[in-house]
Amino acid sequence: MQETGQKIMKLFDIPAYIIGDTCWGSCDLNTHAADMLGADLLFNIGHTISMETIDKKVIMINAYDDVNFDIVVEKYAKDRANQKYKILGIITDSQHLNQLQPSRKILENHGFKTVIGDGKGQLNDGQVFGCEFYPAYDIQKRVDAYIFLGQSMFHSVSIAMSTEKPTFMLDPYFNEFQQVNDKARVMEKKTILSIYKAQEATKIGIIIGLKEGQFSKIKALKFKKSLEVLGKDIQLIALTEITEERLRNFKGIDAYIQVACPRIAIDNHFTKPVLSVPQAEALIKVLKKEPMDDFLKLRHWL
């Protein structure tokens, strides 16, 4: 990226800035920074989605990891040749989309049947985000198990939690594979525990994310209204980065609901309960003395 930026400046005699802040996905493009810099175009490299552009000035550039999956897929296919899971859904994340078809061919050469789910919205066929799982969820009745191509425990565990199907993560860097359903059950128990802890809260902070693709003010206000009816005192908060350190600045709040990104609540450690949108919806059901049902078994957690 640094080299590309310098080449643009030399070839076209225009300023080219590298935005050095974190970027967690197409929900986190930092167009505010581009506007402040007076940039006419913003290139996002690597967060592959089904669209080439977002807004008028954002251009999405596909970039794939060049790691090869052949060894780990062969290893899985040979080790699991006699297993009961014969129809496999193949799923991956943005940087490994180019490995779907080669991996599919290997599995089918070993006698497995494979299914790659259709994309929806920003998702390509066979692609999942950390918060959206349409290509996995929509084929669950057609498959025995899922293969996730990549090293992301969060993505693979999310597939297992949203579908309750056997899910295997194939890691091409260490050429190892593992079933992640036990980890999914542990994570689900943690999410349920947070809900019951939040049930006891007197004052709940509802956090609105200020990143452009995570801004859900209407949903936050809807939760505010529902929880106030149920007797909770509500504090509305707006944050760009939701971290334990920043939440420590707020006093007298017993639990939080953040409507920005489900990964924040599920992935990170917080001293006080921090709920995602599905957890918040389950909390409202619990407060109404209703069963929370399968609150994570959804196509998306937004």
Set out the residue ranges of the language-model regions:
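Peripheral docking tails and interdomain loops at the edges
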Residues: 173-177, 182, 262-302
